[in-house]
Amino acid sequence: QLASEGYEQNAVVYRCVNELANAASRVQLDLFRGGQEIEDHPLLDLLHNPSPNYGQVEFFQAVYAYLLISGNSYILQNGPDNSVPYELYPLRPDRIRIVPSKIGMLPEAYQYVMSGQVRNTYLVDKKTGSSEVKHIKLFNPLDDFYGLSPIMAASMDIDQHNLSNKHNVALLQNGA
């Protein structure tokens, strides 16, 4: 609903999210070790070309836009276990369900859900917290697992703006 009413139907929110995501996605990526810049590294190669579907800019635009719209961004890492992945994919936050653990603050798993069906389950290592899915979230004082979207915090103002626009359009259509 936030994506629809806040992002798709509100030009101000759409512009804000896109401006921030576009600017952040164009930040130059540099890698350093001990104060020395490293110019050739598999991680840099991966970030410059995350997958066949996404270039660097498109990948980071999606990551940042999802974070701003939902308060959560999920990145799927494809590759051999305990090694540098060879592909990265941003996952739609509305399709991710976090399975809370019975004890502790780490989730048990991340589930990828489409049309109400769990398509994939990505387990979380109980000792290290590592998973094929990397979860980036904004602070949420009321939820241990999901981030709080800036759009949610502004939802009343966004609703008011949308309703005012609908009212003004109705007046114009009725010749007022």
Which positions does each model-derived feature cover?
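Structured, contiguous alpha/beta core segments that scaffold functional sites
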Residues: 1-176
